[in-house]
Design a protein with these regions (language model features):
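Generic detector of intrinsically disordered, low-complexity, polar/charged segments
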Residues: 67-69, 292, 319, 447
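Short, amphipathic C-terminal "tail helix"
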Residues: 438-453
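A structural signal for short hydrophobic/aromatic patches embedded in well-ordered alpha helices
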Residues: 49, 118, 384, 443-444
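Short amphipathic alpha-helical surface patches that mediate protein-protein
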Residues: 123, 389, 445-448
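SAM-dependent methyltransferase catalytic region
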Residues: 1-222, 226-229, 238-243, 247-252
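C-terminal substrate-recognition regions of SAM-dependent nucleic acid methyltransferases
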Residues: 36, 227-369, 373-442
Length: 453
């Protein structure tokens, strides 16, 4: 696709075709992905999102802002919706287009190249007075820039994580919450797609976002659990899009099923509401009570001092490193004189159960590749191991586990701590929780990764 192709499509208002060609030919470069967290929303997903806005919205010249315009996918789609919706009000095609790009559409991006691309797509002959901002959108003052107080709708796919070149933290902090805070305040409708980690994450930034969202008038949430919604980009925990509507007065729907956002501390998928209500009373004393973090015995320094001397303390490491290493006793600063169940700190993907489980005696420790659960003796260890291999236990973990990570005790808060005086299996566990055939059938229908029986 060259410049003349773009001009021809724009001139003849073949916007739908132009929108699809953006996905094919105008692709974010690796540096743009890394520095600006730029990820293009696929054409079909953009259409799906825009279809959720009532058709009559596009029949009036509302103001719509795309705050992270990228390569222009949403920008062109928004124009296309207005071109259809305003046909009766403005029969003349050229006049209609001018009203849309002069009065309805606003867009912004930090990348000058993206602004140039959007200008080229919208106005290849430089005929119109476009409303755009080149710079950090989070610092944009729309009153100063455009002499307006807010928008009828804000639509987009904001950056997800901070620029890695601006931090020494290997765990990049989320930033999309800042976009939600800013733009939900200055729009009647906010339609964003973001990672779904905010549903359950205990990261303080996302925990605060979850509390904020519970008090917003969210009309719907559509969640995709798969981590491959975006081409060549993996989003752990999946992605979701939501619509905040200040004029909405009903209950939120999650994947088209009504839910109560405030009922639990996390955002719970609808299919689990009835089931969780049955066993919620058992959650007060839970598996997090026994939890020991991945750094309980080793830190980055002592992990480098592991050796192959079998006379030292046995330390379980990852399979890639041979599963078993050893460490001098005087290198261990914390008490390890207890039995423990260990499991890899990274298990499969989001919404999965436990990976492999091992019993360690009171003379053995583990590396930072594992988390563990502290018990008093072999009998309790065997009991806990049997409990942790039951399918129900894996399901309860998966509900709060949005990514592969088990490094926060909060993901175990909905796994009741059962008596460790018996061997558990699925039948015994179902009876313990007084589950009926309907509940058991539900458990059997759940498909998830995990090492369970």
């Amino acid at each position: 696709m060259d410049l003349e192709d773009i001009r021809d499509l724009a001139k003849t208002n073949q916007l739908n075709q132009l929108s699809q060609l953006i996905d094919k030919y105008i692709i974010p470069q690796e540096l743009e992905k890394k520095t600006n967290a730029e990820v293009s929303t696929p054409y079909k997903l953009r259409q799906e999102m825009l279809d959720k806005i009532p058709t009559d919205f596009w029949t009036k010249p509302h103001t719509v802002f795309e705050p992270c315009s990228g390569k222009g996918g949403f920008v062109i789609d928004i124009i296309d919706r207005f071109m259809t919706g305003l046909t009766d009000s403005y029969p003349d095609e050229k006049q209609r287009y001018k009203i849309i790009v002069d009065q309805c559409l606003y867009f912004s991006d930090i990348n000058p190249t993206n602004i140039f691309i959007c200008q080229l797509l919208i106005d290849p002959y430089n005929e119109y007075k476009l409303n755009y901002n080149e710079g950090d959108t989070l610092k944009l003052d729309i009153t100063t820039k455009w002499d307006i107080a807010g928008f009828d709708a804000i639509i987009g796919n904001p950056p997800y994580n901070e620029d890695p070149t601006n931090t020494n933290d290997p765990h990049m902090k989320p930033v999309y919450q800042n976009w939600i805070y800013k733009f939900s305040k200055i729009s009647i409708i906010l339609l964003f797609i973001t990672p779904s980690k905010w549903f359950t994450s205990q990261d303080i930034l996302l925990y605060k976002l979850r509390d904020y969202m519970k008090n917003c008038k969210i009309e719907f949430i559509i969640h995709y659990a798969n981590d491959n919604v975006f081409k060549n980009v993996t989003i752990k925990g999946g992605v979701s899009y939501f619509l905040i509507n200040k004029k909405f007065g009903g209950e939120t729907t999650f994947n088209n099923i009504q839910i109560d956002l405030k009922k639990y501390d996390i955002i719970l998928e609808p299919k689990y509401y009835k089931f969780i209500s049955i066993i919620y009373k058992y959650f007060e004393i839970n598996l997090s009570k026994l939890y020991c973090s991945q750094g309980t015995f080793l830190n980055s320094k002592t992990e480098k001092e592991l050796n192959n001397n079998t006379n030292d303390i046995l330390c379980y490491v990852s399979k890639n490193k041979g599963l078993k290493k050893y460490l001098e006793k005087n290198k261990i600063n914390k008490d390890y004189n207890y039995w423990k169940i260990i499991t890899p700190a990274a298990a499969y993907k989001g919404s999965s159960g436990f990976s492999n489980l091992y019993i360690l005696n009171n003379y053995e420790i583990h590396s930072r590749s594992y988390v563990s659960f502290k018990v008093n003796n072999l009998e309790e260890a065997e009991s806990l191991l049997s409990y942790m291999t039951c399918k129900l236990t894996h399901i309860l973990l998966s509900i709060r586990k949005q990514t592969h990570n088990l490094c926060n005790s909060d993901v175990f808060k909905w796994i009741p701590l059962v008596p460790l005086d018996r061997k558990w299996n699925n039948i015994i566990l179902h009876k313990y929780f007084n589950l009926n055939d309907e509940h058991i059938d539900f458990i059997n229908t759940i498909k998830l990764d995990g090492k369970y029986i």
